[in-house]
Every structure is written in C-alpha cells, then in structure tokens.
C-alpha cells in the first residue's frame, strides 16, 4: 500500500468527497496542507486576508450548496481569527470542517511561540473538536470530523500540529460517509393530538422559520385547509413568502405587516421549523384559556425553549404535516384570515411603502429606496448576503424571494462584517450567479481587507454599501433604551475611492434621481463592483408593534438630546421617520 503524508491524505479525501476549495491564510504550521492542495488536481486554495473571512465564506458555501465546506488557519492567532465565522456557521447549521493547525507536538504545553489550546477554544462553536496525535490517528479523526459536520449540520474542528501533518501514513482511506440523511418521522401520538387541537380551534395561525425548507407545499396545504394566515421569521422568508396567498409578513424587530397581530389573535398558533428567539413577539399569556401553542421541529432540543407549549411535536415539518392533514375534520371560516390579509395589505401599502414613494428629491438617499430599487433590478436568481444591523431590516422588508433567489446573513450569531465574506463564498460556489453583498459601512469597515480577496480572485461580486456614516442599529437600540446615541457616528468615508485604489470598479451615488440608472449600470458591469450609496443616517426601523416601554425610551432619549443642544438633530430624525411610523 502506497504511503503518503497525512496532509496529502486529508486533501485527497476532501477532494474525493466533493470539496472544491479550502479558504484560509497560509502559515508555517499549515504549510504541509497548503502544499498538498498545490499538488492535487480538483481542489484549490482560496487565499483570504483574514481567517475570519475564510470561515464566513466556507459557511456561506455550505449553506448554499448543503455540502461540506472547508476553511483553515495556522497555529495560534491564525486559527483564533476563525472563531466568529465558525460560530456563525455552527449556529446556522452549516456543515463546515475547520482545520486549525497547531505548534509542533513536542512543544505543546511549554508556552511556545504562538501557543494556544484550539481543542479547548473551539468547543462551544463545534459539534466535534479534537487534536490529531499522529498520522495514523488522524485518519480516524478526519472521518469522524467530516461525518459529524454532515450528520449534525454544523462545525467540526480538526486540530493538526504541523509535524503530524507531515507524518507518513498508509493510504488511501476508503471509509464510506453517509451524506444523504433521512428525515425525522413524527410519532403517531403527537400527530393525533395535533389534529385534535387544530379541529378544536376556531382560528389557526402558522409561524414558520428556516425549518420549512422542503415543506412549502405542505405548509400551504395546511393553510388552505384551516384558513390560516402564515407569518415568518427572516430565516423562513425565502422559503414561504413568494406566491403565498396566506402571507401576513414577518414578526420581530425586523418585522412588517400583520404577522404580530395575527399571532396574538389566533386561538391556535403553530410554530413550524423555527427557533425564533424573541419571545416578546411570540404569543403571550393574556388570560384567554382558548389560546394554544404548538411547535413542530426536527431538532427536539428546540421544542419549548422560547415559549410554553401545549404540544411539542418532534418531526420533520413536511412529514408531520403530511401525517396530520388526512386526520383533520373541522371546517374553518374565512373571516379571521380575510381580516389579517386586509391588515397586511394596509401595512404594506402604508408605512412599509412610505419610504419608496416620492423620494427622488430627498437627500441623503433613503436606504429603503435603495433596497427597493435593488430588489427590482437584481437577477431572478441573485444571491443576497446582508450585514447584521440595518441592512438586515432593509433586506427583510424589501428583498422579494421567488423560489430561486437566496437571502441570508448572520441570523443567529448576529455578528457584524458577515456580508462581504459570505458573498465571497457564494461567488466561489456559484460564479455564474449574481451575488450582492448588502454591506453596512460599519460592517464593511471591519473586514475591508476582503476587497483585496474579491480583486485577487476576480469574483463577480457586487458590494452595495449603505453608507450612512453611522452604526444605525446600535443608534436605534440606544434610543429605545432611553439613551442619546453616542459613539455611533463617524466621519464620512468615500468607499468608492477605496475600492478603486484596490483595483475594483466603483461608483458613488449621492443623487436619488440617478440611483436607478447608476445602480442598474453597476449591476450589469462584469466582474467585481463596489456601489457606494450615501444614505440617510436618521432613517430608523420601526418594529411592527411599538411598546409603551419603547415609546418611553424614545421620549427620554429625545429629551436628553434636546437638553444637550441637539434640537436640530431630533428634528432631522423626526422628518426622516414620520412617514414610517405604524398607523
């Protein structure tokens, strides 16, 4: 049997499994792996400027393809950089293998140069994290790491000392891997009880998350059967909103439409494939004994952790609904559904649409107008990555899914700077598709070096910068807490000029009348392009339901700002947001 280095075995195994690239930054302890990539056909090394970006890119590729993606970092600071991207991938269920190279094995525990303990560091953001002690040991560890990442839809970390990577091993490894996983069949008892609860309720509302992927037809069939409005979290938007006659929008701080009210008014709320964390936007106890809440999820650990349940159903959403639909016997009226659909239409044509009407003369440009125009101009199968912060809001409210588009961000980890590196991963995975990074200037500033990565690999990535010289979401959070915004603004930056300095095509848009023409031209330009749109820093996102506490917070903050001499600032903010207030 031919002998080869463990690094070569690792790279060959990944290539044979279908992995086409490894994202990372080269470094001495990682050299055996990088050299194995160099000499192996069918797999490439994607050089990024920060290992954090490599982890984000791998996570994005895994989320888009559903297949294993790989990133790597050298010993010490190199692999510790990966942690934000790995947290993001792990919490969003992306199968990623991270290769964390390590100092020479004989030096571990001596306080050696760049020594850390990656086998401890990455425990919380992975399902599997182990150190390879020898080449022979590594073959088994590699198999377990890959299988665990695929089976549990999350991160595995392989800690690999550089000298171990160079050790010779027998090869090739011929272990089989289970890459086609089965779905969770629900038990008959909970399905029967679910049918009873649905039949007993006069009004039913469905609230869905990312777990309804692959269950669209079943969800719509249930809604039709029981005349139920369908609301969604951002993670469920791309799978359920389009061509949906039962859609009532989104709940949460990013929300819009009638989703919140529909949920509060229903006798029975069914949570489908969602781990929506904001319990204040979920059905609350109000003394109505008729209120019932059911949750259906393939991950039993998520059942009931956000809100108390009357029934928890462990099962795949599609299989569960297929099982329950034939058991239903009651007939529901249309009145509740029609009332919620009417309220949803009013909300969309009112506050949500306010910033996209008659805005051609308003400067700085309203960010909602930018997002709505982007939605109209982008390709039917475009991939949108959205930065955490206000870009999440604009993406949630104005980017329209159609079954072919993809829209995602840092849904659970909520880290800034995710959009650009995720767009890099999307562009590498699907070079023929239009990939658009909806970047906030705050997020872009954190990992701006990845513009060099976009240029180096000549990616067909469009980077749309919402340039408001402010951390907009942080400003909103401070105002809600009754605090005047402080430390959220910075001096104006010309990001188009920076991109041009890197060698990327760029355009700076400041005139609302020219937005559509300039944006269309930029999107149609082949290759990388940065679109720097100067937007209104005072545009705030109003949630679908404003609480008394939030009103008090705004009032307190406004008073403090005015007393501090900021009368003009408050007037600007009021003028920018008056039309967007819920009515």
Language-model segments: residues:
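Glycine-rich, acidic loop regions that bind phosphate or pyrophosphate groups
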Residues: 100-141, 236-343, 519, 523
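Glycine-rich, anion-gripping cofactor-binding loops and their flanking helix/strand elements
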Residues: 63, 210-294, 402-433, 445-449, ...
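Active-site diphosphate/adenylate-binding microenvironment
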Residues: 10, 15, 28, 33-38, ...
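Phosphate/pyrophosphate-binding active-site segments
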Residues: 1-2, 136, 159-160, 172-173, ...
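Conformationally flexible catalytic loops at phosphate/diphosphate-handling active centers
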Residues: 116, 144, 148-200, 238, ...
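Thiamine diphosphate
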Residues: 31-105, 107-114, 253, 258-277, 304-306, 393-471, ...
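Glycine-rich phosphate/diphosphate-binding loops that line cofactor/substrate pockets in enzymes
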Residues: 9-19, 60-66, 90, 148-152, ...
């Amino acid at each position: 049997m031919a002998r080869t280095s463990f690094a070569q075995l690792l790279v060959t195994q990944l290539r044979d499994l279908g992995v086409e690239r490894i994202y990372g930054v080269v470094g001495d302890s990682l050299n055996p792996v990088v050299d194995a990539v160099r000499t192996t056909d069918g797999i490439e090394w994607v050089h990024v400027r920060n290992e954090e970006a490599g982890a984000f890119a791998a996570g994005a590729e895994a989320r888009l393809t559903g297949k294993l993606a790989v990133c790597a970092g050298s010993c010490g600071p190199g692999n510790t950089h990966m942690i934000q991207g790995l947290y993001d991938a792990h919490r969003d269920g992306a199968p990623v293998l991270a290769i964390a190279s390590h100092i020479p094995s004989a030096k571990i525990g001596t306080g050696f140069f760049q020594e850390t303990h990656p086998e401890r560091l990455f425990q919380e953001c992975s399902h599997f994290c182990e150190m390879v002690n020898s080449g022979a040991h590594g073959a088994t560890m590699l198999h377990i790491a890959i299988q665990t990442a695929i089976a549990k839809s999350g991160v595995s970390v392989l800690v690999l000392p550089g000298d171990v990577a160079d050790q010779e091993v027998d090869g090739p490894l011929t272990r089989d891997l289970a890459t086609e996983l089965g779905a969770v069949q629900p038990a008959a008892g909970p399905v029967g009880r679910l049918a009873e609860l649905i039949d007993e309720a006069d009004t039913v509302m469905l609230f869905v998350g990312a777990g309804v992927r692959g269950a669209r037809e079943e969800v719509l069939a249930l809604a039709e059967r029981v005349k139920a409005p369908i609301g969604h979290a951002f993670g469920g938007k791309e799978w359920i909103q389009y061509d949906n006659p039962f859609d009532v929008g989104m709940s949460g701080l990013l929300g819009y439409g009638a989703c919140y009210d529909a949920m509060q008014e229903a006798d029975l709320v069914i949570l489908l494939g969602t781990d929506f964390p904001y319990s204040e936007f979920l059905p609350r106890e109000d003394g109505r004994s008729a209120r019932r809440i059911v949750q259906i999820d393939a991950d039993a650990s998520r059942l009931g952790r956000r809100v108390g349940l009357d029934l928890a159903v462990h099962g795949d959403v599609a299989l569960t609904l297929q099982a329950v639909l034939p058991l239903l016997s009651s007939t529901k009226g249309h009145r509740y559904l029609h009332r919620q659909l009417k309220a949803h239409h009013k909300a969309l044509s009112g506050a949500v649409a306010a910033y996209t009407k008659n805005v051609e003369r308003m400067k700085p440009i309203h960010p909602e107008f930018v997002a709505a125009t982007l939605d109209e101009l982008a390709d039917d199968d475009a991939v949108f990555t959205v930065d955490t912060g206000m870009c999440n809001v604009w993406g949630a409210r104005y980017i329209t899914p159609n079954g072919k588009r993809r829209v995602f961000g840092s849904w659970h980890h909520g880290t800034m700077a995710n959009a650009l590196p995720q767009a890099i991963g999307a562009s590498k995975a699907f070079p023929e598709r239009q990939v658009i990074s909806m970047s906030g200037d705050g997020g872009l500033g954190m990992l701006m070096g990845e513009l060099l990565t976009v240029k180096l690999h000549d990616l067909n990535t469009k980077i749309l910068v919402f340039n408001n010289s402010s951390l907009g979401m942080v400003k909103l959070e401070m105002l809600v807490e009754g605090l005047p915004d402080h430390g959220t603004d910075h001096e104006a930056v010309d990001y188009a000029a920076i991109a041009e300095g890197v060698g990327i095509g760029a355009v700076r848009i400041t005139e609302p009348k020219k937005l559509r023409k300039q944006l269309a031209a930029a999107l149609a330009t082949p290759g990388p392009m940065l679109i720097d749109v100067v937007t209104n820093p005072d545009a705030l996102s109003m949630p679908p339901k404003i609480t008394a506490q939030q009103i008090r917070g705004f009032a307190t903050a406004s008073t403090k700002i005015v007393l501090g001499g900021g009368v003009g600032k408050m007037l600007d903010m009021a003028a920018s947001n008056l039309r967007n207030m819920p009515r």
